[in-house]
Amino acid sequence: KEDLVKQHAKVAEEAIAGWEKAENEVAVLKQQLDAAVQQNLTLEVRVSHLDGALKECVRQLRQARDEQEKMIQDAMAEKNEMESEKTALEKQLLKLQTQVEAGKAEMPTSTDPDILVRLKYLEKENAALKIELVSCSEVLEIRTIERDLSTQAAETASKQQLESIKKLTKLEVECRKLQAMARKSSPFNDQRSSAVSSFYVDSVTDSQSDSGERLNTVDNDALKMSKLETREYEPSCSNSWASALIAELDQFKNEKAMPKTLAACSIEIDMMDDFLEMEQLAALSETANKTPSVTSDAVPHDSPNIENPLAAEYNSISQRVVELEQKLEKIEAEKAELENAFNESQDALKVSSLQLKETQTRLEGLQKELDVVNESKELLEFQLYGMEVEARTMSVNIDSLKTEVEKEKSLSSEMEAKCHELENDLRKKSQEAEAQQTSGSNSELKIKQEDLAVAADKLAECQKTIASLGKQLQSLATLEDFLTDTANLPGGGAVVAKAGGELWKLHVNETFTPKRDSDPTKVEENVSHSTNENEGESPASSSSSSTSSTTQASTGKSKNGFGKLFSRSKSGVPTLKVIEDK
C-alpha cells in the first residue's frame, strides 16, 4: 500500500511537472505565434506601402513620359513651323532674284558705246550686289569676328569718303577750267577767222587735227575720270556694305550716303557728257564757220554743197543728242527702279536674316530643351530601373517572408497539435490519477474501517479481559504478579498519541503514563498533495485528502505488532507515523 501511495504520488508529481512543462511550452509557442503574426502583419503593411510606392513611382514615370512626349511633339511642331518659314523666306529670295534677273533682261540694249558703258557699269553693280547678297549670308556667320573690326572699317570708310570728296572737288575745278578755256577759245577763233581768212584756209586741216586731238584728250580725260569715279565708288560701296553688316549705325549712315554718292556720280557723269557734247558742237560750229569762209574766199562755187552736209550733220547730231537724253532719262528711271528694288531686297534680306536668327535661337532653345528632356528621361529611366530592381528584391524578400510565415504557421499548427495532444494526455493522466487516488482512498478507507472494527472488537475483548483480570487481581495479593500477568497479555496496552506528538500508554486503571522503557523506531513520510493552478484538482483527491487528514485514530494489528497513527502538524500537512511496539 505504501508503494502504491508512493507510486501514485510520483505519478501525480510527474503528471503535474509534465503539465507545467506543457503549459510553459504552450505559452512559449503562443508567444512565438503572436510574434510571428505581428511580424507577418508588419510585413504585410510594409508590402502594402511598397506596392503603393511602386504604383506612385510608375504613375510619376508615366506622367514624366507623357510630358516628355508632349514637349517633343511641341518642339517638332515648332521646328516644322520654322522650317516652313525658312522655305517661305527662301522662296521670297528666289522671287526677288528672278525679278532682278527679269529687270536685267528687260533693259533695252543699244549699240551706243556710252549706253554700253553704262550697261556694263550697271552689270558690274548688279554683280557686286549679287556678290554682296551672297556674302551677306557668309557675313552673318562671321559677324562676331567683324564686330571687333567695325571701328577700323568706319575710320577707313570716313577717310576714303573724304578723299573721294576731295577728288570730286578737284575734278569739278578742272571741268570749270576747261569750260572757261572753251568759252574763251570760241570768240578768239571767230575774230581770227574774220581777220585772217587766208590763214584759216591754209590751216583748216591743222585746226581740225588740233580740235580732234583736243577732243580725244577730253574724251580720254572723261574716261579716266569715269574710271576713277567707278573705282572710288566701288570701295566706298563695299566699305559701306561691310560697315552696314558690321554695325547698324554705319549701315544707316551708308544707306543714307549711298543715294547721295550715286546721285553725285550720275550728275558728274551727266556733266561730263554734256561738256563733251558742248565741245563737239563748238568744234563743229567752228569748222562750219571756218569752212564757209574758206570756201567763199577760195572756192565760192562750192558753198551750198558744203553747207548742206554740215546742216544735215548738225541736225543728225542734235537728233542723236535728243535720243541720248531720252535714253539717259530712261536709264536713270530704270536705275532708280533697280535701286528701289535693291533697297526692297535689302530690307527683305534684313527681315529674313532677323527671322533666320530668331529661328536659329528658337531652334537652339528647343535643342537645349530636348537635351534637358532627354537627360531627365534618362534619369527617370535609371530611377525606374532602380525601382524595378528594388521591387524585384522586395518581391523576393516578400516571397521568402511568406515562406517563413508559412513555415511558422505549419510549426505553430504542429505545436498546437502537440499542445492538444499533451493536454489530452494530461487530462487522461489526471483522470487516471484521480481514479487511482479514488480507488486507493476507497480501499484504504475500507481497510481502515476494518482495522477500526477489529480494534474495537479487540478493545471490547481487552476490557472484558481487564474486567476479568481485575477480578482475578483482586484475588491476587501482590502488584508484581499483576504486572507480569498484564505484560503477558496479547493486547498489551493501547498506545495513544496526544496532540503534541508524545506517546502515552493506557494502564488498567485507565490512567495515561508516558512509555519510557519502550524503544520504537519511527518512520515519518510526508505526502504532499499538489493542487492544479489552472483547472484545480479533482474532487476525489480532495475528498481522500480531507478524510485522511481528519481521521486521527490509533489502530493496532495483532499480527505484526505495528500501530498507525494519523496526526496533523503545525503546518497543516497530514503526516503518517508508524510506531513499532515491542
Swiss-Prot record:
Tissue distribution: Expressed in seedlings, leaves, flowers, and fruits.
- Report the Pfam families cross-referenced here: FPP
- Whether Acetylation counts among this entry's keywords is no
Top-level taxon: Eukaryota
Q: Give me the stretches of Basic and acidic residues compositional bias.
A: 512-527
Q: Segment Disordered: which positions?
A: 512-582
The reply to whether Coiled coil figures as a keyword in the UniProt entry is yes
Q: Which InterPro entries match?
A: FPP_plant
Biased amino acid composition, Low complexity: 538-555
Q: Which UniProt keywords apply?
A: Coiled coil
- Give coiled-coil spans as residue ranges: 13-186, 310-477
Q: How does it assemble?
A: Interacts with MAF1.
Provide the family line.
Answer: Belongs to the FPP family.
Write the protein's name.
Filament-like plant protein
Top-level taxonomy: Eukaryota, Viridiplantae, Streptophyta, Embryophyta, Tracheophyta
